[in-house]
Every structure is written in structure tokens, then in C-alpha cells.
UniProtKB/Swiss-Prot annotation:
Keywords annotated in UniProt: Chloroplast, Electron transport, Membrane, Photosynthesis, Plastid, Thylakoid, Transmembrane, Transmembrane helix, Transport
Name of this chain's protein: Cytochrome b6-f complex subunit 6
Source superkingdom: Eukaryota
Chief location: plastid
Organism, as annotated: Staurastrum punctulatum
Function (record text): Component of the cytochrome b6-f complex, which mediates electron transfer between photosystem II (PSII) and photosystem I (PSI), cyclic electron flow around PSI, and state transitions. PetL is important for photoautotrophic growth as well as for electron transfer efficiency and stability of the cytochrome b6-f complex.
HAMAP family named in the record: Cytb6_f_PetL
Residue ranges of the TM segments: 4-24
UniProt record similarity statement: Belongs to the PetL family.
Length: 31
């Protein structure tokens, strides 16, 4: 079960990083 929690945490961190990166690129292109 600990592996599932760790995997979910890693997936959540990756998703958050992707969203932040996408928003950052969008703001750069907007300017």
C-alpha cells in the first residue's frame, strides 16, 4: 500500500509540475 501512495504522490508531483510549466510557457507566449 505504501508503494501505491508513493506512486500516487509521484504522479501528483509530475502533474503539478506539468501544469506549472504549461502555464509558464503560456504566459511567456502571451507577452
Amino acid at each position: 500500500m505504501l508503494t501505491i501512495i508513493s506512486y500516487f504522490g509521484l504522479l501528483l508531483a509530475t502533474l503539478t509540475f506539468t501544469i506549472v510549466l504549461f502555464v509558464g510557457l503560456s504566459k511567456i507566449q502571451l507577452i
